[in-house]
Amino acid sequence: MPTVKFAIPKGSIEEATFKLLEQAWQSISGRGRTYRIKLSDPEIGVKVLRPQEIPTYVQEGFYDVGITGKDWVRETKADITTLLDLEYGKVKQVIAVPETLAVEDLTGLIEEFAAKKRPLRISSEYLTTTSAHFKSNQAYQKHFGELDPMIITPWLRVGENKNVQIFLSFGATEAKPPEDVDAIFDIIETGTTLAQNNLKIIDIVMESSAVVVANKSSLRNTKKREKIADMIALLRG
């Protein structure tokens, strides 16, 4: 039975994460054949999961430690401790609109649609963050007060403000405007994909990178805390 359960991300930061693990523990087995990875240290049990899931699973105690993105820690509002910024997987969360739309910032976007009395439609994988960011804007508050933007998914519809609608994206978010939505809330590395889809950035919301997070109860357990400290030392290099 491993002392520490460790969740690592599948997807865009998977390759960089495995390189880091190889530097720290030398011997790794199981990659590509299974979601359960073996390190040279038998006291660490490793499983590969989607980064979106890791903050919540760490919070719930399914895992003691995990690697995920700052963006997903914020999106899930998980009650966990960030131990280390790994400084890879760097992306920016942005709001982008079609180049033909004559607005230059989020305030201008909200004012434009409010003046025309048209619902503003946004596509995003980050429903919580998108809603909170729009609600924090002064133009939003001026027109809609404390109303929550309407969040629309295939199985859920919440929020009172039908004039600002956030649609859950399952990927290829940049392809949605202008036919399906008016704006997107997405992550970028270089911005090339946005330009290829005739989109322009009007707001940079946050910068994100891969981080090591831990369950708070695990950090209060002496044996786990000592093992986690050893892991962090190895990950720092």
Predicted features along the sequence, with ranges:
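Domain-level signature for soluble enzymes in the chorismate/prephenate branch of the shikimate pathway
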Residues: 1-237
